[in-house]
């Protein structure tokens, strides 16, 4: 259920701040969002998979922490990221 190497590379190139940037909050949030979206499809077919649901909740919490960090550091980057990813906040 993980993202393929090509999908990860595409997300990194779309959200990186500079060449070779894989650790910025934008990249990390985008990768987590892609994983979360993929897992949501998994749960439509496998509703009782509670072990994977724990991993999903952990990813959602990690994404929330990164978004809170980015919001505190730079609200314009936060707003741009939320808009690009289509998140609710």
Curated annotation (Swiss-Prot):
Transmembrane segment boundaries: none
Superkingdom to which the source organism belongs: Bacteria
BP GO annotations: translation
Pfam family, one: Ribosomal_S15
GO CC, alphabetical: cytosolic small ribosomal subunit
Keywords: Ribonucleoprotein, Ribosomal protein, RNA-binding, rRNA-binding
PROSITE patterns: RIBOSOMAL_S15 (PS00362)
UniProt GO molecular function: rRNA binding; structural constituent of ribosome
Family statement drawn from the similarity comment of this UniProt entry: Belongs to the universal ribosomal protein uS15 family.
Assembly behavior: Part of the 30S ribosomal subunit. Forms a bridge to the 50S subunit in the 70S ribosome, contacting the 23S rRNA.
Protein's job: One of the primary rRNA binding proteins, it binds directly to 16S rRNA where it helps nucleate assembly of the platform of the 30S subunit by binding and bridging several RNA helices of the 16S rRNA.
Name of the molecule in the record: Small ribosomal subunit protein uS15
Gene source species: Pseudomonas putida (strain GB-1)
């Amino acid at each position: 259920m993980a993202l393929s190497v090509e999908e990860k590379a595409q997300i990194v190139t779309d959200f990186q701040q500079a060449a070779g940037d894989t650790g910025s909050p934008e990249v990390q949030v985008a990768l987590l969002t892609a994983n979360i979206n993929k897992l949501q499809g998994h749960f439509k077919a496998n509703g009782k998979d509670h072990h994977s649901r724990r991993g999903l909740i952990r990813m959602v919490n990690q994404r929330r922490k990164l978004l809170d960090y980015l919001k505190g550091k730079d609200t314009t980057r936060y707003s741009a990221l939320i808009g690009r990813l289509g998140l609710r906040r």
